[in-house]
C-alpha cells in the first residue's frame, strides 16, 4: 500500500471522528486501545495517534503475512512475558511463548541481589535483551507494561519500585538502540520492530468492567486486589475455553494454544478444578514467587494489542468499502458499539461461571 493510501485511511478515520458524538468517540477509543480524552478534541487526537501506530502494525502484517507481539511485565524477581502470532488468514492469535523469570538467578549466578549499581543493571538488562531475541520469530512489536512510580499509600519511592522503573527504562532503550545499531551495520539483515510502553490502565479497562472509584484508601486497595484477581480468573477462563472448545469459532474463544501449551493446559484442567498459571508453565520454586498476576498481565497486554489491531483492521475494511462515506461512518460506530457489548457479555459470561 502506498503512502498516499495509508494517509487516506488515517484521514478517513479523522473525518469519521469530526462530527461524532462524545459517546461514539469513547467507544472507538475503547476498541482500539486509545487514551480516552476528557474533551472531544482530545479524544480525536488520541484516536489519531493510536491509529497511526496500529496502521504501522497493519502494514507489517500485510507485508509479512503475520504479526508477532511480545509483551512484558517488568520485575526483577518476577519478570513475565507472553509472545503471540496472528496470521493474515487466521481469526485468532496463537501463543508462541509464555515465561516468568527470576532475572537475578538467571543472569547473576554469583550475585545475591541486584543493587542500584549502574554496571550491574546494565549487564542484567543487556543479557535480558539478548535472551528475548533467542527464539524465532523476532517480534514485530515489543510492549513493556508502564510501571507506577510510587505505592498508593505513600509519597515515597521504595527501592523495589525504583529498580523496576530503571529496568523498564533501560530495557526500552536497549531494544530501541539494538535496532538502530544493527541497521547501521553494512550487509546485515535489518531489524524491523516497534517498542511500546503499554498502559496497564487501558489494558485493565478493556478486560475488566471498571468499578467505581472510592475515596478511601482501604476501598481502593480492595478494588485493586479485586481487579488483580479478576484478571487472573479471566486468563484462566480464556485458557480453559481455548482448550475445551477445540476448533470452535465461539465468540468466547479468543486465542489458540498449540503443541506443548495445549497439553499442559489440558493436564492442568484434568488434575484439579483450581489451578495456578505457574503450574501450566511448569515453573519451579527458584523462578521467583509463585504468583500469577505477572503472568496474567503479560498475557492480557499481548492479547489486548492483538484485539486492538484486529478491531482496527475491521474499521479500515469498513472505510475501504464501496458504500457512501456517511454510511461507512455509521457502520464504524455501530461496529464499535457492538464490540463493546460483546466484550461486556464475554466478561459477564466468565464472571458468572
Swiss-Prot record:
GO molecular function: crossed form four-way junction DNA binding; DNA endonuclease activity; flap-structured DNA binding; metal ion binding; Y-form DNA binding
Keyword field contains Transferase: no
Oxidoreductase keyword on record: no
Effect recorded for residue 145 to Q: >200-fold decrease in activity
CDD domains to which the protein is assigned, alphabetical: CCE1
Enzyme class: hydrolase
Record-listed E.C. numbers: 3.1.21.10
Protein name: Cruciform cutting endonuclease 1, mitochondrial
Native organism: Saccharomyces cerevisiae (strain ATCC 204508 / S288c) (Baker's yeast)
Gene encoding the protein: CCE1
Amino acid at each position: 500500500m502506498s503512502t498516499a493510501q495509508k494517509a487516506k485511511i488515517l484521514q478517513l478515520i479523522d473525518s469519521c471522528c469530526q462530527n461524532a458524538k462524545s459517546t461514539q468517540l469513547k467507544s472507538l477509543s475503547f476498541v482500539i486501545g486509545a487514551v480516552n480524552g476528557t474533551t472531544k478534541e482530545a479524544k480525536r487526537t488520541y484516536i489519531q495517534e493510536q491509529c497511526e501506530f496500529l496502521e504501522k502494525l497493519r502494514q507489517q502484517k500485510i507485508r509479512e503475512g503475520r504479526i508477532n507481539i511480545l509483551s512484558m511485565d517488568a520485575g526483577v524477581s518476577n519478570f513475565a512475558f507472553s509472545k503471540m502470532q496472528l496470521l493474515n488468514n487466521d481469526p485468532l492469535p496463537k501463543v508462541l511463548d509464555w515465561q516468568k523469570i527470576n532475572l537475578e538467578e538467571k543472569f547473576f549466578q554469583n550475585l545475591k541481589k541486584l543493587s542500584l549499581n549502574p554496571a550491574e543493571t546494565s549487564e542484567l538488562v543487556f543479557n535480558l535483551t539478548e535472551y528475548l531475541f533467542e527464539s524465532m520469530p523476532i517480534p514485530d512489536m515489543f510492549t513493556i507494561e508502564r510501571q507506577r512510580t510510587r505505592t498508593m499509600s505513600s509519597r515515597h519511592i521504595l527501592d523495589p519500585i525504583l529498580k523496576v522503573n530503571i529496568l523498564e527504562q533501560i530495557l526500552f532503550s536497549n531494544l530501541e538502540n539494538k535496532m538502530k545499531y544493527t541497521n547501521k551495520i553494512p550487509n546485515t539483515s535489518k531489524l524491523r520492530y516497534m517498542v511500546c510502553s503499554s498502559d496497564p490502565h487501558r489494558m485493565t479497562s478493556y478486560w475488566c468492567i471498571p468499578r467505581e472509584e472510592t475515596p478511601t484508601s482501604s476501598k481502593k486497595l480492595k478494588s485493586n486486589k479485586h481487579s488483580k484477581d479478576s484478571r487472573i480468573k479471566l486468563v484462566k477462563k480464556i485458557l480453559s475455553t481455548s482448550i475445551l472448545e477445540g476448533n470452535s469459532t465461539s465468540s468466547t474463544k479468543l486465542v489458540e494454544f498449540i503443541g506443548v501449551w495445549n497439553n499442559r493446559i489440558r493436564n492442568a484442567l484434568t488434575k484439579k478444578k483450581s489451578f495456578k498459571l505457574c503450574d501450566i508453565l511448569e515453573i519451579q520454586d527458584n523462578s521467583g514467587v509463585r504468583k500469577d498476576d505477572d503472568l496474567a498481565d503479560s498475557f492480557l497486554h499481548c492479547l489486548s494489542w492483538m484485539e486492538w489491531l484486529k478491531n482496527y483492521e475491521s474499521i479500515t475494511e469498513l472505510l475501504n468499502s464501496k458504500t457512501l462515506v456517511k454510511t461507512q461512518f455509521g457502520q464504524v460506530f455501530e461496529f464499535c458499539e457492538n464490540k463493546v457489548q460483546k466484550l461486556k457479555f464475554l466478561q459477564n459470561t466468565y464472571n458468572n461461571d
